[in-house]
Design a protein with these regions (language model features):
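Intrinsically disordered, low-complexity non-transmembrane regions of multi-pass membrane transporters
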Residues: 1-21, 199-220, 257-262, 418-447
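Juxtamembrane interface elements at the cytosolic ends of transmembrane helices
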Residues: 2, 31-34, 162-167, 178, ...
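Membrane-embedded helical hairpins/re-entrant loop segments and their flanking transmembrane helices
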Residues: 6-17, 39-60, 66, 236-309, ...
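Hydrophobic, membrane-embedded alpha-helices of multi-pass small-molecule transporters
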Residues: 17-30, 156-160, 178-179, 211-251, ...
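Transmembrane helix-boundary motif of multi-pass solute transporters/channels
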Residues: 22-55, 60, 67-92
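Short, non-helical or kinked segments that cap or interrupt transmembrane helices
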Residues: 43-48, 65-77, 122-131, 176-181, ...
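Membrane-embedded alpha-helical modules
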Residues: 91-201, 316-429
Length: 447
């Protein structure tokens, strides 16, 4: 992961106008999934955009501006929202947000523990045979939503796909690095011509508006709310953070593999995890969904090969600004689902391709039964459970819901830790993080 890739690491060489266009491209890439979470949970779309932008900027501050990651709405907590506030009941949503804020706090605690005890003790559980299939699974599980969106109008979706491919493969100069914007514009135009776009919400929306109201935040509930319900929300939702932490490591692995820079070493896992946690706490306090590093934007990095985090920060500023203009937010919301699905198919496929490359570059030997079983279980559980929904179980009076990716990733980590591993099996694994284990094997043989 530490090998420099051929790409643009300093976008200032392109000039500010082009950086702005690239920032807009990242905003378009994340928009569809980011606004879907509040649509499913009943939270505010404008607040979601504001705190996606502010959360991303906070993440960049905490990671020293080194990680080109955008933070958008996390789907992992949808089950938690539904458990506390079924059908998006407005008066119960602040309680769910308190539970999500507690999960963000757990992220912060875990990041401090990693800093205290050293991240090598954590990363030894995440060699390429684990992270590679997890990254592949991230892309493949996301692709289900892309196909669902494409099903609304395959003609519109195919235009987006073809334009993205043509721009990326045959484009020159600026055209080559803005395939997503070109695909969105072409597909959106076709959809508008055939009457697939309803501009009524745009015409009715005001130009300026506040993204959230105080009654939607958690503060009134913290002062005068039901203490028992707050406790229930915390113990129901907080454990989800343990599963999403594994997904976070997969996301950072994907970004590291894409850019050729080891972000586990610099700025460190404790900083990226802290960034996710603080962003989630901030968003939840003001009635927005939990934040997480977004795979869509990793796909954009892989497609355009522009790796400068400054471009992501421009996208974050745009997201925050758009949240204060209901009219612009409505305009972007009119983007047809098929357009979002078309570009997403390419982006999610790029994520899975990064996972395959991770396995190849680290020379993981899949002819060995141990490696094959680990990869098979991660992929089988992640994708299989994702298509059936999620895994739900009850502990006492608490209902816990885990995504397929969380179950698959945790199963792979457990198998990797438990299955016997001989010295020769370390070939191609992450040498820095596995060095301690290699020394343990040598010591055991001496004994």
């Amino acid at each position: 992961m530490g090998n420099q890739k051929n790409g643009i690491y300093d976008a200032r060489t392109l000039g500010m106008p082009r950086m702005i266009v690239l920032g807009l491209q990242h905003m378009f890439a994340m928009f569809g999934a980011t606004v879907l979470v509040p649509a499913l949970t009943g939270l505010s779309v404008s607040a979601t955009l504001l705190f996606a932008g502010l959360g991303t900027l906070m993440f960049h501050v905490l990671t020293k501006g080194k990680v080109p990651a955008f933070l958008g709405s996390s789907f992992a907590f949808i089950g938690g929202y539904a458990a506390i506030a079924p059908n998006g009941e407005k008066e119960l949503l602040p309680y769910a947000c308190i539970g999500v804020a507690a999960a963000g706090f757990l992220y912060v605690v875990l990041s401090l523990l990693i800093k205290l005890f050293g991240q090598k003790k954590v990363m030894r559980f995440f060699p390429p045979i684990v992270t590679g299939p997890i990254i592949i699974a991230i892309g493949l599980t996301l692709s289900k939503s892309a196909i669902d969106n494409c099903d609304t109008n395959w003609a519109v979706a195919l235009v987006a796909i073809f334009v993205v491919i043509l721009a990326n493969i045959f484009g020159k100069g600026m055209v080559k690095i803005i395939p997503i914007i070109l695909g969105v514009v072409a597909s959106f135009t076709l959809a508008a011509i055939i009457g697939d776009v309803d501009f009524t919400p745009v015409l009715e929306a005001p130009w300026i508006g506040l993204p959230f109201s105080m009654e939607d935040t958690v503060f009134p509930v913290l002062r005068h709310g039901d203490g028992a319900l707050i406790f229930t929300a915390v113990i129901t939702i907080m454990p989800i953070a343990l599963a999403t932490m594994v997904e976070h490591i997969g996301d950072i692995s994907a970004i590291s593999s894409t850019t050729g820079r080891d972000f586990f070493e610099d700025p460190g896992l404790h900083r990226t995890l802290m960034g996710d946690g603080v962003a989630t706490i901030l968003a939840s306090l003001f009635g927005a969904p939990a934040n997480t590093t977004y795979g869509e934007n990793t796909g954009v990095l892989s497609l355009t090969k522009v790796y400068d985090p400054a471009v992501i920060r421009i996208a974050a500023l745009f997201a925050a600004l758009v949240s204060f203009s209901p009219k612009f937010a409505a305009l972007i919301s009119t983007m047809p689902a098929a357009t979002v699905g078309g570009v997403s198919i390419v982006l999610y496929g790029m994520i899975s391709s990064v996972g395959v490359r991770n396995l190849v570059e680290n020379q993981v030997d899949l002819s060995k039964g141990r490696n094959l079983i680990i990869a098979a279980l991660i992929l089988g559980l992640s994708i299989g459970i994702n298509y059936s929904g999620s895994l739900t179980f009850i502990v006492g009076s608490v209902t816990i819901t885990l995504s397929g990716l969380a179950v698959g990733a945790m199963s792979g980590i457990l198998l990797n830790a438990l299955l016997p591993l001989e010295e020769k099996d370390y070939k191609g694994l992450n040498k820095d993080y596995m060095k301690d284990d290699e020394e343990d094997i040598v010591e055991e043989k001496k004994a």
